[in-house]
Amino acid sequence: MAKKENTIPTIIDTPEALTAKIAAMKEAQKIFATFTQEQVDKIFKAAATAADKARIPLAKDAVEETGMGIVEDKVIKNHFASEYIYNAYRNVKTCGVLEEDKAYGIKKIAEPIGVIAAVIPTTNPTSTAIFKTLVCLKTRNGIIISPHPRAKKSTIEAAKVVLEAAVKAGAPEGIISWIDIPSLELTNTLMQEADCILATGGPGMVKAAYSSGKPALGVGAGNTPAIIDETADILLAVNSIIHSKTFDNGMICASEQSVIVEKKIYSKVKKEFKARGCYFLNEEETEKVRKTIIINGALNAKIVGQKPVTIAALAGVTIPEETKVLIGEVESVDISEEFAHEKLSPVLAMYKAEDFEDAIAKAEHLIADGGYGHTSSLYVDAVNERAKIDEFASRMKTCRILVNTPSSQGGIGDLYNFKLTPSLTLGCGSWGGNSVSENVGCKHLINIKTVAERRENMLWFRAPEKVYIKRGCMPVALQELKDVMGKKRAFIVTDSFLYKNGYTKPITDKLDEMGITYTTFADVEPDPSLISAQKGAEAMRKFEPDCIIALGGGSAMDAGKIMWVLYEHPEVDFQDMAMRFCDIRKRVYTFPKMGEKAYFIAIPTSSGTGSEVTPFAVITDQNTGVKYPLADYQLMPKMAIVDANNMMSGPKGLTAASGIDAVSHALEAYASMMATDFTDGLALRSLKLIFEYLPACYDNGMNEPVAREKVAHAATMAGMAFANAFLGVCHSMAHKLGAFHHVPHGIANALMLEQVIRFNSAEVPAKMGTFPQYDHPHTLARYAEVARYLGLGGKNDTESVENLIKAVNDLKARVGIKSSIKDYVPDEEDFLNRLDAMTEQAFDDQCTGANPRYPLFKEIKQMYLNAYYGNNSETV
């Protein structure tokens, strides 16, 4: 069989050859992508070792070819690019599973990007090639290098060193490659066909990378200003800047381009620069050098990476051979000043600043004109002048802000600061037109896949810390105010009816017996208003209670909760507190901590609302008529006292409305998306007791103490259930029916209950609940469970639910509740005119979110219509 001819070109000098090479590399990279972390780390170490060993010949090659820089400094660069990069990533995981949390069901997996196009500059050819090839090997990417034409030989040689070592250690052949005869056409082709671009070079090249249509990681122009504050260590500052500026003849893009000195120390700084071998140009010499720095609006390439004496000679200026840095004392920071530009050579501009503010202003201008996003530097007393460091950091639009650090070495990382990532590609963020604002490294060259397994939301069961039950328990429970808590001052909240009819007397008698001072606020309205609550809170502030006792139905207990909030936190905003939430634990608004001033006790006098054990309260703004439903566990009473003796004389209408309200609480809690085994038992037992004992309470409550107590306990259990499972769209619609047409809340729930049961029972709902805690629509089966628990029978779930609906309707009729909204709102035209607004507000009600079926506007509207006319002519 004939041997297959190798069609991969060995010399890349045409678009066709490059395209073929990229295709071959993609195949090699697919193999490389299957390597384990152990295999990759072996290759990474071998490649770094080879580059490290070749640091001197590669440095010589770079200087010989480009005619720029200093061999000894390029040796350090090559050493940094191999040793420091290896050290930074030797133990970093870049293959397979990066992290996994089985409890949360989260796993993060690293995948390589593919083939990386690497643009290499002439200023740092070998070190940048080493850096980029190493990070690509560590991340299992292939890399094709586009060298600068003036540095192609040394760049390619560096890449060869890394490639040979990598292949010898097991890497696929051809995983690193390069363009042999670089051109703009080939570079553009490479950028268009690669998977990602790692660009280091001039602004034009970086812009081309970002305009290629491929993801790019680039750098920006540097124009680093260094401020020397009057509190700085002058020796440290001057010699650090010289150390930085002379390194490789100033070719690191983070090197200082200007030094800004406060006038108080200007002469001392200048003297130190001179003493350390820097040359200050006079006015005539400064002008000559100006014309040499910038030619035709661009940096003169002939000065880049040259010695000061060479640059001076180009300008026709004679200086000592050993001069370290040329310094031009200038005033303008405008772009028209040549010294204000990036110079990439041992040439510095020096400015005198009036003070620190003036220095920062000058630095801001220099950065804005040529160095957005790159690097800035400050020399200051870092111990005693933290405010100046903070001010500098706040105002510099640079991604590296260096303090008391030579910027060439400090900017590339892991030198002078060991948490700054080592890199030879320095991101400049959006300010510099980049996609990254940090030193580029391995994390930027991998795609991270996140595997997220389904987890159910954490649920809970919360109740008052103390719930006391049984007839006659109230005085015994109140005894704790003295014996256990040592309370001194009690504030009673109730309504005028209960106050006038002596309901508060057993409480005040007990308080008198215990020697606890008290006062009573008895102005709670049936729909408690904000102004009423504010009056109560004002009375509390004057009285300064350490205990609040709310006695009454839902209105008194809700009003008491609001007064409690206003008493302890008068700064609260009710609109913020009433904000809707999807998850009560993740809401935007954080409720203030309650109970720091007063202990809250709720004592119900009716069986229905459950407010004594819930974290809910409703308050009405008397000016706008807007009801603010508040929900937060901070509103949960600390103690609930459910003593049926307080409910014995409840009128029939209240008994019926509150009893059916409790039925709706239990049914909605059982059907809720947030229902749990803990709430289910309470809901079911509550329903059992109400169906059994509510008729007797309604008929002859005063003479049925057992029935009264059972219904009272049922209402509280239903309250506990919905305090944790929450309610649903029945309550959403009832709230608005009451608000728009003044239908009592319990009656409104009763009128909507059948429609909601039918709506929720749909096996093919238009929409499931949002973030449901169930895996499929199952509310029909849930309602059937209720029916069977109540002994209602049924051959199947559908029949059982029909039996449940009939039982609910029969109970409503038994306690005198009419069958349709029209019976309570006879003005049909008014009802229909307000229906759309009522529908929208019901949809937006806080209770809607926990409904097992997510309702659409049209579905809510149809339920209202069905309930209004008392029929089910159109299903929803």
List the predicted regions and their residue ranges.
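N-terminal Rossmann-like NAD(P)+-binding subdomain of aldehyde/semialdehyde dehydrogenases
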Residues: 2-107, 135, 275
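Conserved C-terminal structural/oligomerization subdomain of aldehyde/semialdehyde dehydrogenase
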Residues: 3, 33, 317-318, 322-457
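ALDH superfamily catalytic-core signature
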Residues: 5, 12-14, 206-334, 361, ...
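Rossmann-like NAD(P) dinucleotide-binding subdomain of oxidoreductase/dehydrogenase enzymes
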Residues: 97-236
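Glycine/threonine-rich beta-strand-loop-alpha-helix active-site module
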Residues: 158, 531-645
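Carboxylate- and glycine-rich phosphate/diphosphate-binding segment that chelates Mg2+/Mn2+
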Residues: 267, 275, 613-725
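ATP/NTP phosphate-donor binding region
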Residues: 459-547, 821-822
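Gly/Pro-rich interdomain helix-loop hinge
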Residues: 740-743, 747-831
